[in-house]
Amino acid sequence: MIKLGVNIDHVATLRQARGTTYPDPIEAALIAESAGADAITLHLREDRRHIQDRDVEILRGALKTRMNLESAVTDEMIGFALRIKPHDICLVPERREELTTEGGLDVARHFEQVQRACHRLAEAGIRVSLFVDAEPAQIDASVEAGAPVIEIHTGHYADAQTTDEQQGELERVRAAVSKGLNHGLTVNAGHGLHYLNVQAIAAIPGVSELNIGHAIVARALFVGFERAVREMKNLMLEACK
């Protein structure tokens, strides 16, 4: 059965916009769990623009499901992860000027750095995922680096402007999922997925988990966080029937 990882970053974005203590991403995470989330995803960025260290520290002991911590491949962030010991960590690229993660991690280009991080995290009992574009070379490099999980970047699919372009990107994701599975990897997917485009990705055989945040937080403004999570989970499950 396909799983849903709910990303709570944008609850923290709203909090940080005014420098208040609310809305509380911890509360959002617990509501998401009660609504059917299988994991809670959060990205502790180097610039701390939304999620803060304290959020991660509190959440690590509060979750009943899994914490999936997104992190840049830097000594500071890997060191933090080794101290917190999340269940899962997803290594992602990061640029300070970007609004959101704009593409997959170039594992092939930064192979030694990524491989070293994978080994350090694995030795600490943390399951490592690499957020990569739907490119064969990146999947091959992920296998060589020792990551047991990859998350396919679905942003190009989500941003497609025409039906033909979207279909082409969907086929790229399907091929990447198949290649990952053939290598024995667990394959997740995420980025840019929302209520109108999620089902085609959820229906791909072998996809283990989708990580979705912005769309759920946006929907929650109108229907509440619990319902927003349930609606997304139901769409995913329907697509797999």
Curated annotation (Swiss-Prot):
Pathway the protein takes part in: Cofactor biosynthesis; pyridoxine 5'-phosphate biosynthesis; pyridoxine 5'-phosphate from D-erythrose 4-phosphate: step 5/5
Subcellular location: Cytoplasm
Ligand binding (1-deoxy-D-xylulose 5-phosphate): D9, H10, R45, H50, T100
Catalysis: reaction(s): 3-amino-2-oxopropyl phosphate + 1-deoxy-D-xylulose 5-phosphate = pyridoxine 5'-phosphate + phosphate + 2 H2O + H(+)
InterPro entries assigned to the protein according to its UniProt record, in alphabetical order: Aldolase_TIM, PyrdxlP_synth_PdxJ, Pyridoxine-5'_phos_synth
EC number(s) recorded for this UniProt protein: 2.6.99.2
Location of the active site: H43 (proton acceptor), E70 (proton acceptor), H191 (proton donor)
Site feature Transition state stabilizer, where: E151
Keyword entries, A-Z: Cytoplasm, Pyridoxine biosynthesis, Transferase
Alphabetized PANTHER family for the sequence: PYRIDOXINE 5'-PHOSPHATE SYNTHASE (PTHR30456:SF0)
Protein name as it appears in the record: Pyridoxine 5'-phosphate synthase
Gene this chain is encoded by: pdxJ
